[in-house]
């Protein structure tokens, strides 16, 4: 599980 903040960071890192 990941928190909204972590998920957001992962999405940005994906790019």
Swiss-Prot record:
Q: Name one GO biological process term.
A: proteolysis
Signal sequence interval, chain numbering: none
Q: Where in the cell is it found?
A: Secreted
> Domain Peptidase M12B, which positions?
14-15
* GO MF annotation list: metal ion binding; metallopeptidase activity; toxin activity
Q: Tissue range of expression?
A: Expressed by the venom gland.
Question: What modifications does the entry list under PTM / processing?
Answer: Contains 16 disulfide bonds.
Required cofactor(s): Zn(2+)
EC class = hydrolase
What's its EC? 3.4.24.-
Q: Kindly state which keywords UniProt assigns to this record, in alphabetical order.
A: Disulfide bond, Hemostasis impairing toxin, Hydrolase, Metal-binding, Metalloprotease, Protease, Secreted, Toxin, Zinc
Does this entry carry the keyword Transferase? Answer: no
**Entry cofactor note text?**
Binds 1 zinc ion per subunit.
Q: Which GO terms describe its cellular component?
A: extracellular region
Sum up the protein's function in the record's words.
Snake venom metalloproteinase that impairs hemostasis in the envenomed animal.
* Record's subunit section: Monomer.
State the similarity comment.
Belongs to the venom metalloproteinase (M12B) family. P-III subfamily. P-IIIa sub-subfamily.
Its name, as the record gives it, is Zinc metalloproteinase-disintegrin-like
């Amino acid at each position: 599980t990941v928190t909204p903040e972590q998920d957001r960071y992962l999405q940005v890192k994906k790019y």
